[in-house]
From Swiss-Prot:
GO terms of molecular function: L-lactate dehydrogenase activity; L-malate dehydrogenase (NAD+) activity
Superkingdom of this protein's organism: Bacteria
Protein name, entry field: Malate dehydrogenase
Keyword Transcription: no
Binding annotation for substrate: 88, 94, 126, 157
Active-site residues, as the UniProt record annotates them: 181
Pfam families linked: Ldh_1_C, Ldh_1_N
Family the UniProt entry places it in: Belongs to the LDH/MDH superfamily. MDH type 3 family.
Reactions that this protein is recorded to catalyse: (S)-malate + NAD(+) = oxaloacetate + NADH + H(+)
CDD domains (alphabetical): LDH-like_MDH
UniProt function note: Catalyzes the reversible oxidation of malate to oxaloacetate.
Lineage: Bacteria, Bacillati, Bacillota, Bacilli, Bacillales
Enzyme Commission number(s) from the entry: 1.1.1.37
Taxonomic source organism: Staphylococcus epidermidis (strain ATCC 12228 / FDA PCI 1200)
Binding-site positions, NAD(+): 13-18, 101, 124-126
Amino acid sequence: MLMVNRRKISIIGAGHTGGTLAFILAQKELGDIVLIERQQSEGMAKGKALDILESGPIWGFDTSVHGSVNIEDIKDSDIVVMTAGIPRKSGMTREELVQTNEQIVRETALQIATYAPHSIIIVLTNPVDVMTYTAFKASGFPKERIIGQSGILDAARYRTFIAQELNVSVKDVNGFVLGGHGDTMLPLINNTHINGIPVKHLISEEKIDQIVERTRKGGAEIVALLGQGSAYYAPATAIYETIDAIFNDRKRLLPSIAYLEGEYGCSDICFGVPTIIGYQGIEKIIEVDMNNDEYQQLQHSAQAVSEVKNSLKFK
């Protein structure tokens, strides 16, 4: 009898982001899905899994979606996505999240190493740069199999704001965002184009500065508007794009949080940089040319991430 080896994606955290990601992945039929929640939130995981399954006949997908509170159910996953953690509240800085979420991520990474030792881990828990570093250290996985995701999201916000300003299709806006996920992120203005035309030729420097600042505050803007909770549609879609690049070995050039060993003058830090994403995970880190001002801003961002990282104790 022919046995089909189906791909498996486990999502730890069945909240807004985890549930939305599961729904997107189910529609795309990228693999079987397991939604994991805490014991006291069993109904959330199972309820969302069932709700997604029941949309299958309408959307036309046959994806298996399973909700569980048993971490053992991630066994043999190809990809494990970590969205679990306390949510960011209005007025809360990313750094204030770090102590509680570090413990959650550390414990989860150890469990992943036990039950899915050959998986690729994608981290979304905030503050995501430091949580990616935590997952890297705790899991013992090789660096190419630990991916933090914020750059796709930040670049999407940046591109959206530019498209709105120019009243053009966002499909024609190409831009990259490097650095930490927060107030020190660095949109590469000199590398931003609208269908090949440099953005500086179309938007004033003052307006570009406003767009950059809005991009940096993009997460906080959503938090303030919602009043409770944080963004989840765009973050979930960013994770989907990463998973699609891995499973289909697309060799996509995508901004990701990667462990650096000298790239961009940074070492022993997880940080947002351009990466090639394929079947092995982060297959290459791309170093782009930048002027002195951009380089100094990037170093400032790295220092901010390092300060949060250094407040924790890693063995």
